[in-house]
Amino acid sequence: FNTIGIDLVAMCVNDLIVQGAKPLFFLDYLAVGKLDLKKSKKILSGIIKGCSLSGCSLIGGETAEMPGIYSKDNFDLAGFSVGIVSRKKILSKKNVRINDIVLAIPSNGIHSNGYSLVRAIIKKHQISKKIKKDLLAPTKIYSREVLKLVEKNLINAAAHITGGGLVENLLRSIPEELSLQIDLSKIKIKKIFKWLKKKKISDEEMMRTFNCGVGFCLIIPPKNLEKIRKVFPKK
């Protein structure tokens, strides 16, 4: 349970930085049937770590016991984050131009999308400890790197690759009159996605359900490519 909190924060702050906004603070909400202190402390530790990684403050939240709504072992976890950005630095599809480059930033794994399909698969197949670990890898938080680029005006637009995969999320980040060319051969596919593909999932469903190794995309002017590459580790 110590990585769920990271996922929660990541899904909020990664959506904020798509607009160029710096995450300022985060609040969480945990609803349970009966409070399990050991479990809730692990969840909270993940939220704290997520806030630390994203550079925002955890300023409050609520924990509610509702035995009439939730069974003993079930819980509901939610949260939200508020960010700030100067109007002149807002990232928008209006900024995108013909011949801009789309840069794919690697994911840690499947992040926080596609788990309904994953659960259906693992009900039918035995999985190793390594696969379990890979499936639970927390969502990567991109705020520190992306905000450096926003501050230097190096990005035109961005996309957080969540449900809907590369195509659906990227299309929301460009004007309707433009189109994209994606070179899939440039994407390094992690082993966890190769494992999932072997479970008889079609290419179309893989691309629509999972990030397939790309957690975030930047749409940039070609002249800024080398400057941006220096911000991210070569791996």
Give the residues covered by each predicted segment.
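Short loop/turn motifs at secondary-structure junctions
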Residues: 20-22, 117, 154
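Active-site mouth loops of central-metabolism enzymes
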Residues: 1-6
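Glycine-/charge-enriched secondary-structure boundary and capping motifs
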Residues: 39, 43-54, 70-75, 124-136, ...
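Generic structural signal for well-ordered alpha-helical scaffold segments
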Residues: 13-14, 147
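Short, compositionally biased
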Residues: 115-125
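Glycine-rich anion-binding loops of enzyme active sites
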Residues: 7-8, 12, 22-115
